[in-house]
């Protein structure tokens, strides 16, 4: 949720650093979400098709982390927009599969409690992440370190997801089973 809320709150500000008008910022901000919404559907469908979840969460998070790091390089607007678009694709593709994990592992009351806990912790990340980005931006005067913070958060997500995949868990059914 750190990346989801981080890109949602701060992408317009990152784009604004290129000196664009508010209308241009608005249009450019919509582009990553257009591609991310398409990727989200396709990636979720692919995960259902082959019945795999862990790597369908970890790989997009890796993409998002690499893209956030790429966007921190101070590249021209077109390159930064490409990087932010890939970051959005990675985040939203991961989210499309992520929510199937707790219910695949937990059942009954445990599933309800597990989903509540995951949602609560995620919302804390959604609260803290954008605030941390703001503090970093204010302290450094640019978004470079803040975007690297987001890259690091995605790397933690990849590691945690891969570690969860190494734990024995019941088979995850394919869609329609």
Which residue ranges define each predicted feature?
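Extracytoplasmic gate region of multi-pass secondary transporters
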Residues: 1-45, 95, 99, 129-130
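A membrane-interface helix-boundary motif in multi-pass transporters
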Residues: 21, 134-153
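Loop-to-transmembrane helix entry/capping segments in MFS-fold secondary transporters
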Residues: 22-23, 108-118
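Transmembrane alpha-helical cores of Major Facilitator Superfamily
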Residues: 30-34, 116-124
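Helix-to-loop junctions at the C-terminal end of transmembrane segments
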Residues: 39-52, 137
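C-terminal transmembrane helical hairpin of 12-TM major facilitator-type secondary transporters
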Residues: 49-101
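Paired intracellular helix-loop junctions of major facilitator superfamily
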Residues: 51, 101-112, 141
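Multi-pass alpha-helical transporter architecture, strongest
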Residues: 148-177
């Amino acid at each position: 949720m750190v990346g989801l809320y981080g890109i949602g709150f701060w992408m317009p500000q990152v784009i604004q650093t290129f000196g664009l008008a508010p209308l241009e910022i608005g249009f450019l901000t919509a582009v990553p979400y257009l591609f991310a919404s398409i990727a989200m559907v396709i990636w979720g469908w692919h995960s259902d098709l082959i019945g795999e979840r862990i790597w369908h969460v970890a790989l997009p998070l890796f993409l998002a982390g690499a893209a956030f790091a790429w966007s921190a390089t101070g590249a021209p607007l077109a390159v930064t927009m490409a990087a932010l678009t890939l970051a959005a694709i990675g985040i939203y593709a991961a989210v499309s599969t992520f929510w199937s994990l707790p219910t695949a592992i937990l059942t009954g009351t445990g599933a309800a409690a597990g989903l509540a806990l995951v949602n609560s912790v995620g919302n804390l990340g959604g609260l803290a992440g954008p605030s941390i980005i703001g503090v970093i931006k204010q302290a450094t005067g640019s978004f470079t370190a803040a975007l690297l913070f987001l890259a690091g958060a995605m790397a933690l997500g990849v590691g945690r997801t891969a570690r969860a995949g190494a734990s024995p868990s019941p088979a995850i059914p394919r869609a329609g089973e």
